[in-house]
Amino acid sequence: MMQLMLYASTLITSIILFKMNHPLAMGLMLLIQTIQISMLTGLMAKSFWFSYILFLIFLGGMLVLFIYVTSLASNEMFSLSMKLTTISLFIFSMILIINILLDKSSISFFIQNNEMQSIYNLNMFLQENSLNLQKLYNYPTNLMTILLMNYLLITLIAVVKITKLFYGPLRPMN
Amino acid sequence: MLMMFYWSLPCFLFLMGVFVFVSNRKHLLSMLLSLEYIVLNLFFLLYIYLNLMEYLSFLGMMFLTFSVCEGALGLSIMVSMIRTHGNDYFQSFNVL
């Protein structure tokens, strides 16, 4: 039931994102979607490590929005329409009602045994999918980690070289 | 019911991100944010796929690192364009 509610809310978030115009509102939707997807991936595996990393990375990407909005798009309004909210709540409740009508066992946890719990936690494919990262630093695949380090360093240098301009302010010019 | 959503949800979210990307937005940052949205949903799909493998989940880390690097490069291109041309309107790209 928890996962189904998360699925329905991700669908609603994607539909709301489709109607957004302002970058700040799109960033807010992206942040909500990141929280939902990290909760979903945490529920699929046995530990929340990956979802923690995902949330921190995308939250760091959101920090650029504030300087953007304060310097470039400071005079734009954004509004959430009432019709869109009504349609979203309607779709959300429709998905929940259809699920309850089709599958009555998904609303009650206490009648399930252990195998059914594992089905509803959606890690039924492998018994041992604890998503461990022990190949990250061992020999045949640590070369990919070294490649990642070099790529990050080259990206750092490239970003500094691209944004090294000594003319023009960071503000809109109409 | 849940298994019906299991693989089709990230594909649907990916398609929604692609629709947001190709719909004509005003700012360049909206395009970059929709690209981040596509990357997020592709990471979700990759995570579901790597649940089937046993020890390959470090590929998700690699995917996240590459996506972060490309996002940083896109933002640096946007900053450079703002400082040279004054705005980041997507409609004025054919003038550049």
UniProtKB/Swiss-Prot annotation, chain A:
GO MF term list: NADH dehydrogenase (ubiquinone) activity
Superkingdom per UniProt: Eukaryota
Main location class: mitochondrion
Cellular component terms per the entry's GO annotation: mitochondrial membrane
InterPro entries reported in the protein's UniProt record: ComplexI_Subunit6, NADH_UbQ/plastoQ_OxRdtase_su6
Swiss-Prot/TrEMBL catalytic activity: a ubiquinone + NADH + 5 H(+)(in) = a ubiquinol + NAD(+) + 4 H(+)(out)
Entry keyword annotation includes Membrane: yes
Disulfide bonding pattern of the chain: none
Transmembrane spans: 24-44, 48-68, 82-102, 143-163
Cell location: Mitochondrion membrane
Keywords, sorted A to Z: Electron transport, Membrane, Mitochondrion, NAD, Respiratory chain, Translocase, Transmembrane, Transmembrane helix, Transport, Ubiquinone
Role this protein plays: Core subunit of the mitochondrial membrane respiratory chain NADH dehydrogenase (Complex I) that is believed to belong to the minimal assembly required for catalysis. Complex I functions in the transfer of electrons from NADH to the respiratory chain. The immediate electron acceptor for the enzyme is believed to be ubiquinone.
The name this protein goes by in its record: NADH-ubiquinone oxidoreductase chain 6
Organism: Ceratitis capitata
From Swiss-Prot, chain B:
Topology class, membrane: Multi-pass membrane protein
GO molecular function annotation: NADH dehydrogenase (ubiquinone) activity
EC code: 7.1.1.2
Entry's localization field: Mitochondrion membrane
GO CC entries: mitochondrial membrane; NADH dehydrogenase complex
Keywords, alphabetical: Electron transport, Membrane, Mitochondrion, NAD, Respiratory chain, Translocase, Transmembrane, Transmembrane helix, Transport, Ubiquinone
Main location: mitochondrion
One Pfam family of this chain: Oxidored_q2
Known function: Core subunit of the mitochondrial membrane respiratory chain NADH dehydrogenase (Complex I) that is believed to belong to the minimal assembly required for catalysis. Complex I functions in the transfer of electrons from NADH to the respiratory chain. The immediate electron acceptor for the enzyme is believed to be ubiquinone.
Stated name of the protein: NADH-ubiquinone oxidoreductase chain 4L
